Amino acid sequence: EKVYGMSKPYINNSQLIVVPKDSDIKTLADLKGRIVAVQDDSTGSYLLEQPANKDLAAGLKEIRKYPDFAAIYMELDNKRVDAAIVDAVLARGYYDKKKPDTYRILDENMGDEVVAIAFRKDDKEFRERIDKAMDEMKKDGTCKKISEKWMGADITVYDK
């Protein structure tokens, strides 16, 4: 927010752990000694570098960083990694829709976040127009319908 203007948050997101369906990994603790994939410069990658996750990261056999989401799936498909840390938005849209019988998402996650749109700091009028449109879409149920269609659940952020 120091460099960009931000819209109101519009999506709730989490960093999920995805494993092959037949994996014996059930919890974050089970990742010890395993190879974990993350997208480079992603929230998942960032979280593994934080002091709160120091012990988890130190216990991993290896953290492999990939340039994009597709490369991570390829590594999971070919069993070159044991697990992946990915955005819930991406995981729900891909794993749940395209490969529901291939992967499993752990109950535990690496953390929650909200998603917003970044704007040029001096573009306040455009940001306000986007916020207004998003508020209207939340109010009339459009955001909920889109979210349920593509994510399988309503992950919209609503004002309290």
Q: Where are the regions a protein language model picked out?
A:
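Periplasmic-binding protein-like
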Residues: 11-19, 88, 92-135, 153-160
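Short helices/loops that flank or line small-molecule/ion binding pockets
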Residues: 3-5, 29-32, 68-89, 97-98
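Short helix-initiation/N-cap motifs at beta->coil->alpha
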Residues: 23, 63-74, 113
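Beta->alpha turn/N-cap motifs
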Residues: 13, 21, 39-42, 68-69, ...
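Structural recognition of the beta-strand scaffold that forms the well-ordered cores
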Residues: 16-18, 36-39, 64-65, 83-86, ...
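Extended ligand-binding regions for polar small-molecule ligands
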Residues: 25, 29-43, 92, 116-154
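Acidic, polar ligand-binding/catalytic clefts
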Residues: 1-30, 109
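Ligand-binding cleft/hinge of the Venus flytrap
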Residues: 44-65, 95-100
